[in-house]
């Protein structure tokens, strides 16, 4: 099997989708998981104002609303978490995303002071963080806050990882990659966009240039610039289409180099790294 087909199979991507049906797949998946794990009462998700968290948030709120109605358990709750580092440049988009999702509860935690404290403590020990590593600190601090909220509310931390992100490993290990459940897994970027269009989401939330926006020396650096390929190329590749050979090599190199991110901690029984 060619590596492209191996990747497509591993990530479960379909060449075409029915947006309405895929929305229901994700909603029913979350509902079934919570019904199986009866001690879980909340879903916790960080909202950035971008496509992925907006879609995931809408899925979470729909699942929780249906669970309350179907089970009669009023304790079920979706908690949307705002996690700015200082002043967020796309604050208006975040507010629009929250308005679209209509979460049961919104919690805002500014992580800037926590990052500054961590940076200062490490510096005292002789470890001076680069801008890149500090960016990963931000991603991990955001997840730490979400897990604290989940721990106090009998919750699960929900991830936004999807196929176009997973194939490149474009997430922080034990940061935004460290979650309990990922309802977007199997969808690529354009498919996620199609779901939001189906749901009537304001288009500026899914047409904006995706950015992790973690590095202060390169603020709002577009994902596509960091990756060296466009999401259109990634989506075409994941749908089994033939793309430019150079772009395909970039995607495959990312996939192979970041395998450790998609795998539990390596043990003596693993051989994927050899």
From Swiss-Prot:
Keyword Electron transport: no
GO cellular component, one term: cytoplasm
Binding positions (Mg(2+)): 52, 165
Residue numbers binding ATP: 46-53, 160, 189, 211
Recorded catalytic activity of this chain's protein: deamido-NAD(+) + NH4(+) + ATP = AMP + diphosphate + NAD(+) + H(+)
Pathway named in the protein's UniProt entry: Cofactor biosynthesis; NAD(+) biosynthesis; NAD(+) from deamido-NAD(+) (ammonia route): step 1/1
Family matches, as InterPro entries: NAD/GMP_synthase (IPR022310), NAD_synthase (IPR003694), NH(3)-dep_NAD(+)_synth (IPR022926), Rossmann-like_a/b/a_fold (IPR014729)
Record bears the keyword Transmembrane helix: no
GO molecular function: ATP binding; glutaminase activity; metal ion binding; NAD+ synthase (glutamine-hydrolyzing) activity; NAD+ synthase activity
Top-rank taxon, per record: Bacteria
Complex and partners: Homodimer.
Classification via HAMAP family: NadE_ammonia_dep
Name of the featured protein: NH(3)-dependent NAD(+) synthetase
Organism this protein belongs to: Sodalis glossinidius (strain morsitans)
Source lineage: Bacteria, Pseudomonadati, Pseudomonadota, Gammaproteobacteria, Enterobacterales
Gene transcribed to yield this protein: nadE
